[in-house]
């Protein structure tokens, strides 16, 4: 089966980044602590998908984003994913917990479940340092 496309949003506040704890009833990666993400619909532009997913999951309207990296990931249910990760640099609204079990600001990468999310944050931090 071909990998599906997903978009990942990285929202930073000071030295902290926004993470979510996925609900236990989710078929993909239940209960993990991860960056907010979602599937790209067929024919949908990646940036449009990110805007839609962040509105659905967090209730925010993304105004500006910067591409960080593309990752390959195999989810707990075996789904293969190409994850397009973006740092969200400007948005309207306050993040709300709409689809996850909870959302919170985290500053310790070790508290995140997925190594791929940890590496994505590191890549984003290196990009920031090189500019």
Language model regions located:
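A conserved beta-turn-beta hairpin within the catalytic core of GNAT-like acetyltransferases
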Residues: 26-31
């Amino acid at each position: 089966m071909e990998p599906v496309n997903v978009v990942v949003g990285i929202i930073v506040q000071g030295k902290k980044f926004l993470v979510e704890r996925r609900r236990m009833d989710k078929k993909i990666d239940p209960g993990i602590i991860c960056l907010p993400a979602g599937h790209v619909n067929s024919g949908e532009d990646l940036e449009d998908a990110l805007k839609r997913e962040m509105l659905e999951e967090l209730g925010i309207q993304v105004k500006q984003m910067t591409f960080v990296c593309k990752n390959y990931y195999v989810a707990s249910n075996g789904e293969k994913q190409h994850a397009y990760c973006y740092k969200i640099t400007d948005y309207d609204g306050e993040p709300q917990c709409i689809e996850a079990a909870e959302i919170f600001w985290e500053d310790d990468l070790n508290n995140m479940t997925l190594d791929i999310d940890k590496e994505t944050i590191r890549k984003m931090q290196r990009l920031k340092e090189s500019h």
